[in-house]
Amino acid sequence: MGLYGLEWCGKLAEIEGRMDAEQYVEILDDHLLPSIEESGIAEGDCIFQQDNDPKHTSRKARNWMEENDITLLDWAPQSPDLNPIEHLWHHIKLQLCKYEVPATGVWQIWERVAEVWNAIEPEVCQKLIESMPRRVEAVIKAKGGNTKY
């Protein structure tokens, strides 16, 4: 799991097995809060976007967000074209395809993902976030249908 802001990439969290609401909240504690602190975002100024996966919308996760003064951005279900992290993962996949030798195990895949994640330039994150008004406009123009994003 990864998170990023306008000019930064947060800490990458390795997920083993299937994530549930409890593990999600642990990741928020261990990765989101430190990333927010390191980014210099003032307390209460963080607006967090996530999809509507049940673990994200669980009572446990909602309570955690409230307790940590993090505003959630309302999000339409089934809208990956509006989800900038999906496009960042696509960028990572393209970078992973550049390795000439296939990874020999899960540990090596994780190592490579972390290497690519840590090398992401802030401009990549900035461009994705700044593309949001165009993305929203395209969805409105398509009346909720498919877009080029």
Each model region followed by its residue ranges:
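Electropositive, glycine- and tryptophan-enriched low-complexity nucleic-acid-binding patches
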Residues: 1-43
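RNase H-like two-metal-ion nuclease catalytic core shared by retroviral integrases
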Residues: 50-52, 58-60, 74-98, 104
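Surface-exposed helix-capping loop/turn segments at secondary-structure junctions
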Residues: 37-46, 121-127
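Eukaryote-biased feature marking scaffold/signaling PDZ-domain proteins and nuclear chromatin regulators
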Residues: 7-10, 43, 68, 80, ...
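C-terminal anion-handling pockets and recognition modules
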Residues: 85-149
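Short alpha-helical patches at protein termini and domain edges
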Residues: 59, 70, 109-112
